[in-house]
């Protein structure tokens, strides 16, 4: 059975464009590699407009990723490129993301 997660990432609004560039340059390359190996079924990042948790000065994003199983998800999370991306992205976050 596929394994999926939805993550709500909160980014300071003044860093939203920089976060999107970083995501496009670093995380999308990882997704492309995993998809070409059959280790990622689908994934997306969407900028949220409006919502019950909207906060001034914060831009929310929904990141969805679906893997064939937990082993493939763990392979993504253990990828050194992802760990490097995550260190940079966390600097833009006023609080921890919500993960389901």
State the predicted function of each range.
Residues 26-42, 56-60, 64-100:
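An amphipathic, aromatic/His-enriched active-site/gating alpha helix that lines ligand/cofactor pockets
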Residues 21, 53-57:
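Conserved, structured core segments of small domains
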